């Protein structure tokens, strides 16, 4: 496995990202250790909130949520998935698998001895985070899903997804900043777009971003389906608090909250919402999301 590491100079003077970098080595069951970057802000003994990003972003996506959450006394942790942000980037699409991504994040949880966290997930963060919540329930005490789902290949996949999958794999360029700007309601400035482009100096660094759409299970024959279906069954017994906050203007996942709310017992009576946002809901409504999490957290005390 050939691994790339984005130069630190790419992350200097980013717009609205004053956070300290932390690193640790993570492993999957069949790979050597890789360096994962993460943010760890707020009091070390505060209630832990973990924020998981998705495709093709990194912890930069959470920059407007972190300070309000830490100002309220929470410890906020936001890792960059392997292949993204300041984390190591295996250089081949074939180096990535759904199971490896789950393993890498579980390894990160284990190294930091995290348990009873409030877990906020979006996009691929939900595909990973929902598996972890189901398979290691002691690690997650409260669960928030925003524009996410757990694929079990039991529903029709929208044609638009297959177009996105082909684009991600074969397009000569994969402009992360432009992708984010298309998936938002509000205008994304050139400086912010540059923040999303920062992890990828050139296309050789983008194998992880190109791999993600290929790894979404759409067929019952996909190797991830047995574990995902088992996790879905476990979520059907999840009685801890579950909250769905979705972007009403997300063209693909804007209504994916309904199956989650119906299936997960812990969703009953919670203040679920569809807000004026598109797919990158954190970019559209980051401070509002933070406020909703804090209000929910307070109500659960």
UniProtKB/Swiss-Prot annotation:
The active site is at residues 123, 250, 279. Optimum temperature is 50 degrees Celsius. The keyword Hydrolase applies. Gene3D superfamilies: alpha/beta hydrolase. Residues 47-284 form the AB hydrolase-1 domain. Optimum pH is 8. It catalyses: 1-haloalkane + H2O = a halide anion + a primary alcohol + H(+). HAMAP family: Haloalk_dehal_type1. This is Haloalkane dehalogenase.
């Amino acid at each position: 496995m050939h691994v790339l590491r984005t130069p630190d100079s790419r992350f200097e003077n980013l717009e609205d990202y004053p956070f300290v970098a932390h690193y640790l080595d993570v492993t999957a069951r069949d790979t050597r250790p890789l360096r994962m970057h993460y943010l760890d802000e707020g009091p070390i003994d505060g209630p832990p909130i973990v924020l998981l990003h998705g495709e093709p972003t990194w912890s930069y996506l959470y920059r407007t949520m972190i300070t309000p959450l830490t100002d309220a006394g929470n410890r906020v942790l936001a890792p960059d998935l392997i292949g993204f942000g300041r984390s190591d980037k295996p250089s081949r699409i074939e180096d990535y698998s759904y199971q490896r991504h789950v393993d890498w994040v579980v390894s990160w949880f284990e190294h930091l001895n995290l348990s009873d966290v409030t877990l906020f997930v979006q996009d691929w963060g939900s595909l990973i985070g929902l598996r972890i919540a189901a398979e290691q329930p002691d690690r997650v005490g409260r669960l928030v899903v925003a524009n996410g789902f757990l694929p079990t290949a039991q529903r029709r996949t929208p044609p638009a997804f297959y177009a996105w999958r082909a684009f991600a794999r074969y397009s000569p360029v994969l402009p992360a900043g432009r992708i984010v700007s298309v998936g938002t309601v509000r205008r994304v400035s050139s400086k912010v777009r540059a923040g999303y482009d920062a992890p990828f100096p050139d296309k050789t660094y983008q194998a992880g971003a190109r791999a993600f759409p290929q790894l979404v299970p759409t067929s019952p024959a996909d190797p991830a389906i047995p574990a995902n279906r088992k996790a879905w069954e476990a979520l059907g017994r999840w009685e801890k608090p579950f909250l769905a906050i979705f972007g009403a203007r997300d063209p693909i996942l804007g209504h994916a909250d309904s199956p989650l709310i119906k299936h997960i017992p812990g969703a009953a009576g919670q203040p679920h919402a569809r807000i004026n946002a598109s797919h990158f809901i954190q970019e559209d409504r980051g401070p509002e999301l933070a406020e909703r999490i804090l209000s929910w957290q307070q109500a659960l005390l």
